[in-house]
Amino acid sequence: VKNHDIEAAWNYHNATKHSHESIRANRHYLDWENQPKPFKIYSQLEPIPLPEHLSSSGTPALFAVSAADADAVGPTTLTSQTLAEILFLSAGITRRRPYPGGEILFRAAACTGALYHIDLYAVCGNLGGLDAGVYQFSPQDFSLRRLRAGDYRAVLVRASGAEPSMADAPCMIAGASTFWRNSWKYQARAYRHCYWDNGTMLA
């Protein structure tokens, strides 16, 4: 059943859009003593290191994202190696730059305020080198952490309304926002950023 009542969406949009007045009237400040952690940490789960030797497909990025079908950009066999490449190019740390008092981490996909609130999860069947399960991608040490053992892909297929393109996918990658990591700076606008930043990673 489609929901044609979009009044709530318009109300949110109008309440959170920027204007000359709203920017000057907002007294919000960054509470550095309460800054969110930049990563979700599962301290009691063992990391499963991902392959660190990442190859290049040789395909220009604009061609890859505009291709009409998967065959245009090469084979689609998925292994832990190709999964590592996808995760790195979506949310990986591409460079580290030290500065007095810390380190700046550059990521593969841009994010509002460089807060990187979208965490990625791989839901897969048995892949070459990786058992079926639900895994959290940990960019800080380039590893996976298994949250659930077993094949949960059917759960996502049902949640999608039985989307045909998902039915035979060997792996699905889901993005979820750690909302506080973004709203700490952007307050109510963070809900917009969940979609902007997730879309940037998916592209």
Regions found by a protein language model. Name each.
Residues 1-203:
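N-terminal accessory segments that position/regulate proteins before the catalytic core
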